[in-house]
Amino acid sequence: LIVAEESDTNSAQREEIATTLKGKTVQSSTAVRYEELSKTAGKENDKQSITLLATDDAYNFNEYLTLRDRKTHQPQILVNNGAVISERLAEMLNVSVGDTFTVNDENGAQRTIKVAGISEMYIGHFIFMNAQCYEHVFGDQYSTNAYMVRLKDHSNANTERQGAKFMKLAAVRGVVQNTTQKNMVSTIVGSLNQIMEVLILVAVLLAVVILYDLTNLNVSERIRE
């Protein structure tokens, strides 16, 4: 879960979030910077939504989100001079490690980001960076406005239940859940499996037809002989 705070919270409201984060259903949490960026790109050249997550605890960030190279499975480390971006975002922007690209922040200002790594991630567009990189890119002092939350029970039902619980808090602006993405992946995989089953069945039937035709051909030739 990503739990985003309202910008104008008071101490009592923040304490309410802190108490919930210490609840029995939560395994651990870490404060992060969460922003929604945008970029006009893609095949249709339309506005794409990009999620930014920045942290001042890069060492433990992989406990909440796995960043790794798709081919080598090597961990992607958050460094000061560039960001790690999701694989789909890299493909959409046609960028590689060492390249730079621009995005628009929530106020419409254009920001330039250098690609330090590309992480295996098949759904959504994401940018990950450490606090030093954030300050360099946005020219602002790093501050947190959200929490990444690990739940003890990772089931979809519990994730949705805990997300709804956080949404009831006055200081919470929104909750981002990964259940939708997980369901989408499951649906895609299920559809691909069905397609593969159909293709295998067609291949088997085609092989039977070919063998039948070859057998008839051999029989006909022997009769003529």
Functional labels for PLM-detected ranges:
Residues 77, 118-154, 179:
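Small-residue transmembrane helix packing/gating motifs
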Residues 1-3, 45-47, 60, 139-144:
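Membrane-proximal juxtamembrane linkers immediately C-terminal to transmembrane helices
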Residues 1-49, 156, 160-168, 174:
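Hydrophobic, regular-secondary-structure patches
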Residues 19-28, 32-100, 112-114, 118:
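Short beta-strand boundary microenvironments
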Residues 159-208, 218-221:
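Peri-transmembrane interface segments
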